[in-house]
From Swiss-Prot:
Function: Seed storage protein. Might be integrated via inter-chain disulfide bonds within the glutenin polymer.
Segments traversing the membrane: none
Keywords: Disulfide bond, Seed storage protein, Signal, Storage protein
Name of the protein described by the UniProt record: Avenin-like b2
Highest taxon of source: Eukaryota
GO molecular function per UniProt: nutrient reservoir activity
Post-translational modification note: Contains disulfide bonds.
Annotated signal sequence range: 1-18
Protein family according to the UniProt entry: Belongs to the prolamin family.
PANTHER family attached to this UniProt entry: AVENIN-LIKE B5, PROLAMIN PPROL 14P
Amino acid sequence: MKVFILALLALTATTAIAQLETTCSQGFGQSQQQQQPGQRQLLEQMKPCVAFLQQKCSPLRMPFLQTQVEQLSSCQIVQYQCCQQLAQIPERTRCHAIHIVVEAIIQQQSQQQWQEPQQQAQHKSMRMLLENLSLMCNIYVPVQCQQQQQMGQQPQQQQLQEQLTPCATFLQHQCSPVTVPFPQIPVDQPTSCQNVQHQCCRQLSQIPEQFRCQAIHNVAEAIRQQQPQQQWQGMYQPQQPAQHESIRMSLQALRSMCNIYIPVQCPAPTAYNIPMVATCTSGAC
């Protein structure tokens, strides 16, 4: 019976993808012919992600299946295939693959929806896709993509702050439990805290050692800017002991949480304090 169910699901998934191939290929037109072979291969591999993100899927009823776990929809099947394909792509190529997905979706949208400059639209779409795919698939996707840098160079400080946004989110405990869309997979129920903590450590490990101090300072600045202004009255005067102590504690927390080297001597660049919060223990907030 299990073999029959698996075969049926595979047949259903293949049928769903076959129905989507025509729509995807027609949306690109002649632009596909100008793409390099590697790009065409990535686009073919990422078709389930294009279909899912455009919500080109409809509920699929299978009344002859008895258990609730087996009551799948075509959306769930395409979502699973998207995550499976993305996991098979090497990390260094995922940015490029997602960029191809963005271009495919933009080309299929009507021009009326893109009144703003095309580069800004692509930049926003890229950021949204990175966040959605990273959380949906519970997989690492680099925040700083080379394709993003081609769309518009940002100052180095802003790049570091954007790259360590997961660290700021984690340190402020702005996370809540999430559920796994496929309960039949024997994995623990992860929390968004664990996902964000993993992203924070991965991003921090990719930053060269000589820039990590500045990156942590940018995280502190991001946290400070998100706090109500009344909480910071009187904190803009130089308070060197408090600054160094707060930064030292923040560095120590990230150092132990990520098990990564961060220079002990990390001077404070500006005269502000860092609001301290307790870190999560064993990935639980």
